[in-house]
Amino acid sequence: MMGILDELRGLSAAEDFFRTLGVKYDAEVLNVARLHILRRMGTYLSQAELEPDEDAARAQCRAQLQRAYDDFTRSTPIAERVFKVHRDAVRPSGGFVSLSELTQDGT
């Protein structure tokens, strides 16, 4: 018998994960954050101890995919910083720059 993790490993498209686990999604959200959602789901699953019962394990996977998806319905991939390239990027300082600093001629 194939376990849920083996089944998920055989999937390639993000939409397949959502269909397999029965999680509803907005195509616009998925088109922008598909890799981020799946990576976040993987992080959540790696922190969880899956139940030995197949139905319970499937429910856990479904819940973690839903949780990861929800993260990106409320935020953006850049703000969530799932991938190293985003984590290493310099965060905007949000500091104030006065108009006089922008218009000084160097004197």
Curated annotation (Swiss-Prot):
Domain of life: Bacteria
Keyword Transferase: no
GO biological process annotation, one example: nitrogen fixation
Entry annotated with the keyword Zinc-finger: no
Keyword tags: Nitrogen fixation
Free-text function comment from the UniProt entry: May protect the nitrogenase Fe-Mo protein from oxidative damage.
Subunit structure: Homotrimer; associates with NifD.
Family from the record: Belongs to the NifW family.
Protein's name in the database: Nitrogenase-stabilizing/protective protein NifW
Source species: Gluconacetobacter diazotrophicus (strain ATCC 49037 / DSM 5601 / CCUG 37298 / CIP 103539 / LMG 7603 / PAl5)
